[in-house]
Amino acid sequence: MAKEKFERTKPHVNVGTIGHVDHGKTTLTAAITTILSKKFGGEAKDYSQIDSAPEEKARGITINTAHVEYETETRHYAHVDCPGHADYVKNMITGAAQMDGAILVCSAADGPMPQTREHILLSRQVGVPYIIVYLNKADLVDDAELLELVEMEVRDLLSSYDFPGDDTPIVTGSARLALEGDQSEMGEPSIFRLADALDSYIPTPERAIDKPFLLPIEDVFSISGRGTVVTGRVERGIVKVGEELEIVGLKDTVKTTCTGVEMFRKLLDQGQAGDNVGVLLRGTKREDVERGQVLAKPGTITPHTKFEASVYVLSKDEGGRHTPFFANYRPQFYFRTTDVTGAISLAEGVEMVMPGDNVEIKVELIAPIAMEEGLRFAIREGGRTVGAGVVAKIIA
């Protein structure tokens, strides 16, 4: 029989499991794939397959992540699970796995623990928009009042980080029982309840192509008789011939007009998210544009120099610094396609930052970058990556 073509008829949503070590994230991931594959097709993955997560690199940082896929009645999900706490921090900060929603796994027997809190905070800082809770190991709790207490604790914790704790779906169950095929409420049915919560609570994400046009400029050429061409990969949206655009970052924002789009030496009438294109600009001089700026739909992105960020500083073993850094440390910040020097200030009471730390910092760049909350960057010293970060809040 011919290999079936991958039919992308259902909308695609990216999710992942978060939560404290040993609360059952990987067991739950195995249970979801196993149980949903029986009903909707797809591939079941067992615990050991997920736990032996392969290494991958994102922004010069090595991360262990397991990727699984599953289907529900209405959607196709791509799901990430990380073996260690440090992998979660790195994954979420580098944006290696952008999540449209997260499944917070919390053991009903233990209640919220330090990493439960840390992962919720991280989700808030890196812009994970929705969290659903799976209260795991509920089969080990005999007292219904105790379950209610843990549920209240989790809701309060979510609310304290500006998630809607009172409205968050909480599914109570046992991933282990579900994996063993148990048909009680705690077993397989809890996985179907979780799938329903995912389907109904996380809205279908806006596709990259439907967002406002943005292209990080990688190179600039001058074509005699035609004008200036900028090249790069369209990050989001669509650009059409004849549209007015803005060039943002590094200098004052200027307006320009797209007079042509080229891909593989062919002229097109438009370029869209994912395309590597050359965009011909009218009335723009070659020397007015440079790598590191962005070409964008007018009014959709602005240049900034000051921001708050959540960063992960590479450990010595990961090829990072061997020594701590202090306030006023001035590395380069690599945004999209270029490095910009900036000065770091630390939170009050924080004397220094050690390699391997995950901290909140404030940054002031020497030149403005087209920026929005959620933008990822690398921290570099002389071309070597020493950290990764995400813009949590723009100051100026």
UniProtKB/Swiss-Prot annotation:
Domain tr-type G: 10-206
Binding-site residues, GTP: 19-26, 81-85, 136-139
Pfam family, one: GTP_EFTU_D2
UniProt KW keywords: Cytoplasm, Elongation factor, GTP-binding, Hydrolase, Magnesium, Metal-binding, Nucleotide-binding, Protein biosynthesis
Region (G3): 81-84
Segments for region (G4): 136-139
Organism: Chromobacterium violaceum (strain ATCC 12472 / DSM 30191 / JCM 1249 / CCUG 213 / NBRC 12614 / NCIMB 9131 / NCTC 9757 / MK)
Name listed for the protein in its UniProt record: Elongation factor Tu
Quaternary structure and interacting proteins, as annotated: Monomer.
Sites where the protein binds Mg(2+): T26
Region feature (G2): 60-64
Catalytic activity: GTP + H2O = GDP + phosphate + H(+)
GO molecular function, one term: GTPase activity
Compartments, as annotated in UniProt: Cytoplasm
Function: GTP hydrolase that promotes the GTP-dependent binding of aminoacyl-tRNA to the A-site of ribosomes during protein biosynthesis.
Region: G5, residue numbers: 174-176
Family named by the database record: Belongs to the TRAFAC class translation factor GTPase superfamily. Classic translation factor GTPase family. EF-Tu/EF-1A subfamily.
The keyword NAD is annotated on this UniProt entry: no
SUPFAM superfamilies, sorted: EF-Tu/eEF-1alpha/eIF2-gamma C-terminal domain, P-loop containing nucleoside triphosphate hydrolases, Translation proteins
Region annotated G1, chain positions: 19-26
Gene: tuf1
